[in-house]
Amino acid sequence: MKPTPINIKNKRASFDYEFIDTYTAGIVLTGTEIKSIRLGKASLVDTYCYFVQGELWVKNMHIAEYFYGSYNNHSARRERKLLLNKKELRKLEEAGKNPGFTIVPVRLFINEKGLAKLVVALAKGKKQYDKRESLKEKDDRREMDRMFKR
């Protein structure tokens, strides 16, 4: 029996931001953290990325404590280091310094090798009217789908 694929998305990010470029990064995790992710007990709500001394870190990513973990369990909202190539890190850091741009986690998944990966995007914040426009387009698409189903 094939295990269910883990695909945790930050739905709010696509509403609040316009994605310019995306990167797939590895995450430095402890044993109980990867076990919780495999159970689907993670959330990307209110998560953001920042640089410290040329390294990319993710803050506020919630990974629930592992139920079967002992006293050695992890802290649910600790900061976690992201792993990217130096070239990608430099490119992201330079672009992230520009006003209006930020680095946002978009999706957390487990690849074919069983490693946890985080898709991060270089993003620009949307204005209020852009958000309304996105909602209108989404509603229009939904209406069109309903019409074609009949």
Curated annotation (Swiss-Prot):
InterPro entries: SmpB (IPR023620), SsrA-bd_prot (IPR000037), SsrA-bd_prot_CS (IPR020081). GO terms for cellular component: cytosol. GO terms for molecular function: RNA binding. Transmembrane segments: none annotated. It is found in: Cytoplasm. Gene3D superfamilies: 2.40.280.10. Residues 130-150 are annotated as: Disordered. Keywords: Cytoplasm, RNA-binding. Pfam families: SmpB. NCBIfam families: PRK05422.1, smpB. Belongs to the SmpB family. This is SsrA-binding protein. The gene is smpB.
